Amino acid sequence: TNDKVKMLIKSKKISPGDIVWADYQYKGRGQYKNTWNSSKGKNLLISVYREFKGLSFKQRNYINFVISLSVIKTIEQYVSNDNFIKWPNDILSGQKKISGILIENNIKGKELRNSIIGIGINVNQTRFRNIPNATSIKLISNNEIEIEQVLKKLIKNIDEHINILIVKDFDQIMNLYNSKLYGRDFCRFLINNEIFQ
């Protein structure tokens, strides 16, 4: 869906806030060129086009933070597991991956021009071939969920969190983000080739 948004930007057929929504994906992209397939009609697969006027190149990570918070808040409206953000782009529910995020930023000079925000949430899929450690809202809740309903909640949560970003309340964003960060309760150290926690 991110590639489709890029095509629409090039042809000037997209506006800030527009969404590209796919029913299924067979060439989903993640970090480090990882790919995956999604069952038809089972998951929420979108890309959102947004402009962030006034944000600098150095502040681009805050987009990742607010999107991660938006996704996790949406998932928490359906499942009560321990839900965490696994830096940089995964959302975990009960130690299993339930969502992935891929954000591609367009930078000009030191200014952030726009972002393509790709989000995949496992909603009703129950079998994940060749993907160990994956889960979905349905697997956790035992309920079939209307995907359009998940989309509406997600967009509402994105708008709320982006409003915090627009007013540059970076402290609030970081406090919220750190409260949901996976592994925040321990640190690992390497001393003389030995790992300590």
Model-identified regions with their sequence ranges:
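N-terminal lobe of the biotin/lipoate ligase/transferase fold
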Residues: T1-Y78, E144
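General beta-strand structural signal in soluble alpha/beta enzymes
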Residues: A22, N83-W87
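Long, positively charged amphipathic alpha-helical accessory segments at protein N-termini or as interdomain linkers
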Residues: K53-N83, S93-Q197
